[in-house]
């Protein structure tokens, strides 16, 4: 029915076209079969299969890992320390046949270690350096208070331990004896005065006060109003006595005869020399201004005690001894008729004034006339 009205020439053309198509299809099928045999040849090849370096079994998975020139299952490549799977890590480290992650490798085999925690320091990590030691940023803290030290902070090191500035200073100060608390010692010992030395104290400007505090007073028991040419006078420079628990060596200054004569003679003229007079006296006697100041201070104290004894009727309050009564011819002491200069006193042929009490009226509270050293010299 289908071929009934079709001419013979057209039917022959259709048959040839169908034959040609069938040949092309058979050729394509052979090509596909050959390609299939070529691709499947490695799977049936007699080569030895790869073994996993981790578990030792054959690798039959589609994908595997290659590390340290060995094949690994994806699940078998892991750190031998922390068991971290390294299939997704960018790097891994091998040492003596063992596999390590980055953290464990630097912790165990890093060249530089933190001086505080002794763990490894990676090459990309920020560090703090102190002398020859290297620290993690989090480990660079004070040993005492754990204060984190940053760039610009002051710190100190003792036996490779880091301290902040406050604790390091307290550590250094603790190695020395604490200074004596003189106020506390004075409260316990009933008063304590600091010792002084020749020329060590500052020069007092102007005229010194006549009355000194008990702590600064200097007691002298060897002062005599007269001068013996055969003996040398000594100035005991001890201050108020120290507590019994403290033993101090007494410091004494010896005066030569001409020095003692000069000082006593000027004391008869002026009991309280000023700084300028002390300077000229120091040049004349060769003594320091401090020694001269102490001597005049003790001389004034001795002089006041003598005056008080005479005013009390010759009774010494200290020892209760009686002094000879004053002369009935005159109720007051008479001042010397002439003043003696220091230039004359240094001459042995002139009599030295032997009493300092004769220049002051016992009923007069004022001081004798002032005479400067400029006129005396």
From Swiss-Prot:
One of its GO terms (molecular function) is metal ion binding. Residues 50-111, 112-174 form the LIM zinc-binding domain. It comes from Psalidodon fasciatus (Banded astyanax). This is LIM/homeobox protein Lhx9. Residues 248-307 bind DNA. Residues 228-249, 309-346, 358-377 are annotated as: Disordered. Transmembrane segments: none annotated. Its main location: nucleus.
